Amino acid sequence: MNKNLSALSLLWISITSMVGSGWLFGSLYSAHFAGPAAIIAWPLAGLLLLFVALSYAELGTMFPQSDSLACLPLYTHGRLTSVIMSSMTWFGLAILPVIETQGVIQYASNYIPGIVTHFGVYYRNTPLGYMLSLVVLMSFVLLNYFGIGLFARINAAFTVWKIIIPTLTVVSLITMSYHPENFFQYGGFMPYGWQGIMAAMSSGGVLFSLLGFRQVIIMMGEIKKPGKYIPLILAGSLLFTTLLYTGLQWSFIGSVSEQALTKGWVNLSFTGEAGPFAALAALAGMVWLSVLLYVDAFISPYSTGLVYSTTAAHMLSSMDLVIQTPQVFAKRNKYQVPWVSLGVNFLLAATMSLVLHGWQEMSAFLVAILMVSYSIGPIALVCLRKQLPNYQRPFRLQGGNLIAFIGFYVCTVGVYWAGFHSVRKLLVITVLGLVCSFLYCFIKNTHRGLDSKQALWFIVYLFGLSVFSYFGNYGGKHILPQYWDLLALLLFSLFVFGLAILSRKPSTHTRRLVAEHVQQTGKNELTK
């Protein structure tokens, strides 16, 4: 594999993937759900996701290949679990450019009439808006077609811009339009309690904005010495973006006018709210900043969508490791780019643009599907320590078993907070994906040896999440007592976590697969 990325470039990619449309909309929707207490949601989410990221730091340095994410569940639980988790990961990555494109469209609706319709803070594209979104999605394909080196050079320039503009926005709004009374009036600091904070994390775009750290793991095979740099890149990018988003939330809450809050934070409304920060800048008389933010409203989500388009193509091209897929998916052009996978992902993104509506709805759904796919990381960390105890680990996580369980619990509550509306879609897509996978395996006569027994834990997990979500307090029936639902989810997570570890494949299976894989990649690191 060509080593075309430096560690610094990968750090830029990680930051870029977490500073996209989330910074343009996350503060608005988080304040809508939690009021001023939304400022707590960002550092809390960053801390919770750190437990998940630490699990991937150890795993990533064990298997520093770009296709390692696709292989983890195959190593630990066999083919069926790997098919499910890898398909969900790929699906989530493939449609992430859709929400970044939606960010571009919603901001643009303030100066291009007729591309969106909306009711309150909920938006959907018109036919013209949909056609514009297709143009943006196609441009991702064209840019990525010319290779990872070009991608890195473009992305580095984007990242510098994406750090400067949000920082300038925070300083300008606090300096020119700051109302400290906003934090304690209109219902107080926590008008909707802790439930509002938890809703803000999943449905308000907080978790979604910070979930991009895993792009590092997917692309780490493109850099030299991943064992040295991956943990630092993961922790550093997560810390930086958490601080940046917290500052943005602070400036947003403090700069909203009294007139916009007459009906409370849940009914927050002001002129031009489709582009919230640009609108606040204009209302404060900073037209120059408003214009700059409209420019950034294209650059930030566009560059993030470019990152996701790249990583999703790499993910799809490596899925033949876990399920028999058409060989054409792995076909690369002279720039070593899986161009067929880019095209397939474009078709999926174009389809999902018709199914999902508006940035807020998209972010909640993506949190649900990504958190489920992230849950395999903490489980794999514990399983692989039992299956491959002597395998070389350039970074070994201290207290790994406890941190892994906390990370798994974070994934569980993240799905629950996303709400029943999102979990219901997740369930439908998972079932459809399983049916299609089984049909394909039967057609190719590869359905034997699917390791169905080792996948039962995931069926229990998905069914349990659906039940909790249906009876829960986030779009469900509100039957579960508030806060007791989190305790029940803790016990449920402990049960599933233990079941998943007990369901792991024998060590001989794991050693054989890893040996075969690293031999193929020329990186045989098994200790004798």
Features from the language model and the residues they span:
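Transmembrane helix-loop boundary segments of multi-pass membrane transporters
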Residues: 28-39, 100-103, 112-126, 149-158, ...
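TM-loop-TM module centered on a large, flexible mid-protein loop between adjacent transmembrane helices
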Residues: 71-74, 78, 110-115, 233-306, ...
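Helix-loop-helix junctions that connect adjacent transmembrane segments
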Residues: 1, 39, 117-128, 156-290
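Helix-loop-helix connectors at the membrane interface of multi-pass transporters/channels
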Residues: 74, 101-131, 165, 222-226, ...
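Membrane-interface loop-to-helix entry segments
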Residues: 108, 128-178, 211, 234-238, ...
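Membrane-interface "cap" regions at the ends of multi-pass membrane proteins
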Residues: 1-37, 50-54, 66, 186-187, ...
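Hydrophobic transmembrane alpha-helices that form the core helical bundles
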Residues: 29-33, 41, 50-137, 141-145, ...
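Terminal cytosolic tails of multi-pass membrane transporters
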Residues: 1-4, 381-403, 424-528
